Amino acid sequence: MSEQEDQEAPKQFTFGTVGFDARFPNTNQTKHCFQSYIDYFRCIKAKGEDFVPCKQFWHAYQSLCPMEWVERWDEQRENGTFPAPI
């Protein structure tokens, strides 16, 4: 057997971004980022983490929000100081 046969074929990677949301028609997506973060945690609080439509909000905030913001918001939620009701 050759060395190439021993290696697995590379996995196909598909790149996707968030679709259009009529609530946020402008190019500045900061509000869309923040609202998707809030919507995700409200959704899993109401329906549970296994509820598939909640994943749409997760993908939105993971795609739009800088990770530093998400880390800070996670910390604020844990401390009870998050600036919006969830």
UniProtKB/Swiss-Prot annotation:
Disulfide bonds join 33-65, 43-54. PROSITE patterns: CHCH. It is found in: Mitochondrion inner membrane. Keywords: Disulfide bond, Membrane, Mitochondrion, Mitochondrion inner membrane. It is a peripheral membrane protein. Component of the cytochrome c oxidase (complex IV, CIV), a multisubunit enzyme composed of a catalytic core of 3 subunits and several supernumerary subunits. The complex exists as a monomer or a dimer and forms supercomplexes (SCs) in the inner mitochondrial membrane with ubiquinol-cytochrome c oxidoreductase (cytochrome b-c1 complex, complex III, CIII). This is Cytochrome c oxidase subunit 12, mitochondrial.
